[in-house]
Swiss-Prot record:
InterPro entries: 14-3-3, 14-3-3_CS, 14-3-3_dom_sf, 14-3-3_domain. Belongs to the 14-3-3 family. PANTHER family: 14-3-3 PROTEIN. It comes from Pisum sativum (Garden pea). Pfam families: 14-3-3. It comes from the Eukaryota. PROSITE patterns: 1433_1 (PS00796), 1433_2 (PS00797). This is 14-3-3-like protein.
């Protein structure tokens, strides 16, 4: 007879099913239950990756919607279609409300449970990076004092993660590289500091290249993928500084086996 599964194991399995079915809101719910079942115990690498993938997909869909609606709003404004603009603004604020709720949910979980229970260097960096990411997503659409506050919280999260990463993780570690990638995107997009963005991305890339021969087979693929994204952004940003282009900036993407 098969051994009885704990509620925690059952919820992990349900989260994987929800991921396969691309039902990410439910995946979030299952992983929040896993976190609750864990009490003060740390999540496993698999569990934290599933949680990250779930939230990244839920927030990613709304971020994409917000960008599309904002673009349409700008076009309608330039055409002077005030009636349309008013309708679009209402719709945009609905999406922004959803974005805020999602970010508030994961940030609360990070502050109350995930960060306090993190014991290893890589899990601390993972969660602090995540904290920076979700404050950055708030900074993308907030304005005025709220945007300033979100940007400051992003910087605090990323800097805390960077301090631990530099001290405890090798330059080739996928989580350290993913942090550098997203931190540099923050400098470029939110703080409008292309020089700082390029310096951070270049330093992370160069340090990783210097130690590439120490990479194990396990993380080689993950690390080299993020290094490629760092290089893509550097190429894009240096050409942007010359001709003000607007191609797509790359961020660390969620993966089930190794989450950046």
């Amino acid at each position: 007879m098969a051994a009885a599964h704990t509620p925690r194991e059952e919820n992990v399995y349900m989260a994987k099913l929800a991921e396969q079915a691309e039902r990410y809101e439910e995946m979030v719910e299952f992983m929040e239950k896993v976190s609750a079942n864990a009490d003060s115990e740390e999540l496993t690498v698999e569990e934290r990756n599933l949680l990250s993938v779930a939230y990244k997909n839920v927030i990613g869909a709304r971020r994409a919607s917000w960008r599309i609606i904002s673009s349409i709003e700008q076009k309608e404004e330039s055409r002077g279609n005030e009636d349309h603009v008013a309708v679009i603004r209402d719709y945009r604020s609905k999406i922004e409300s959803e974005l805020s709720n999602i970010c508030d949910g994961i940030l609360k979980l990070l502050d109350t449970r995930l960060i306090p229970s993190a014991s290893s260097g890589d899990s601390k960096v993972f969660y602090l990076k995540m904290k920076g990411d979700y404050h950055r997503y708030l900074a993308e659409f907030k304005t005025g004092a709220e945007r300033k506050e979100a940007a400051e919280s992003t910087l605090t999260g990323y800097k805390s993660a960077q301090d631990i990463a530099n001290a405890e993780l090798p330059p080739t570690h996928p989580i350290r590289l993913g942090l550098a990638l997203n931190f540099s995107v923050f400098y470029y997009e939110i703080l409008n500091s292309p020089d700082r963005a390029c310096n951070l991305a270049k330093q992370a890339f160069d340090e990783a290249i210097a130690e590439l021969d120490t990479l194990g087979e396990e993380s080689y693929k993950d690390s080299t993928l993020i290094m490629q994204l760092l290089r893509d952004n550097l190429t894009l940003w240096t050409s942007d500084m010359q001709d003000d282009g607007a191609d797509e900036i790359k961020e660390a993407a969620p993966k089930a086996d190794e989450q950046q």
